[in-house]
Amino acid sequence: MTRIYDAQKFNSAYLEFICKGSFNEIPDYYPRYRSRYAALIKKYCDLAPSTPLKVLDVGGGQLGLLCKKLWNDDAWVADIGGAHLDYVAAQGLQVKIWNLCSEEPPFKEEFDFIFFSEVIEHLPMPGHIVLERLKIALKPGGMIICSTPNLYRLRNIVYMAIGKQIFDYFRIPENHGLGHVMEYSIDHLQWQIEKSGLENCHIEYCQMPHSPNDPVFRVMYWMGSPLFLVPRFRDTLVAIAQAPSN
């Protein structure tokens, strides 16, 4: 039996532990992007059994924290460091410092699920290398949910048309993380996932309503929203894949 997504319980936990929590983004980021977190938690509910699981959130830890508060999952977070890790540790998550770009995985076949949300676009290296490291951390048959911006999203088309820089400079990070150094098309992401050795890959275009930061682009977003009926222009790719069962 899969889990039941309860919107009221999700909204309550999201407000208390995410919007009022201590994370890296500016305070109004999390109210604006609630729909993304809700969509990914719904995906998780569709795939996860009702019994508690061991879950790893690679990145900020918000999804792992929601799993802990909603279902008492054994939730872990792995990141390169930051004050947000103290906050999630105080909320009951296990914390591991891990630089995905330069370090081999500190786990082997430990996790039922891994959340890899809005991270791969920040990493200046082939995606299949980091995905292979995550595969090692999964139990046989364990699953990964990966979300990342769609290369062909409407925002990028507008940026290219007006000559605005789309990506951060591609370089080795020094003492801090990078912006988006690359984004993936659906076929490119599929190739990277399959190259890593993960199996049963399924990727879909998703549009998760939000309000852009810049007021000008906020107006353009709403004016152009009918174009999201065309899947290729949607903002986000959501991929689900599985570690080999053997």
Name what the model sees in each region.
Residues 145-168:
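Conserved class I S-adenosyl-L-methionine
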Residues 128-143:
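A short glycine-rich, Lys/Arg-flanked "PGG" loop and its adjoining helix->strand segment in the class I
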Residues 166-176, 228-237:
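Low-complexity, charge- and small-residue-enriched intrinsically disordered regions
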Residues 29, 167-188:
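Acceptor-substrate binding/catalytic loop of class I
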Residues 1-117, 127-132, 182-187, 204-240, ...:
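Conserved N-terminal segment of class I S-adenosyl-L-methionine
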Residues 122-123:
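A short His-aromatic
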Residues 186-204:
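A SAM-dependent methyltransferase catalytic signature shared across enzymes that methylate proteins
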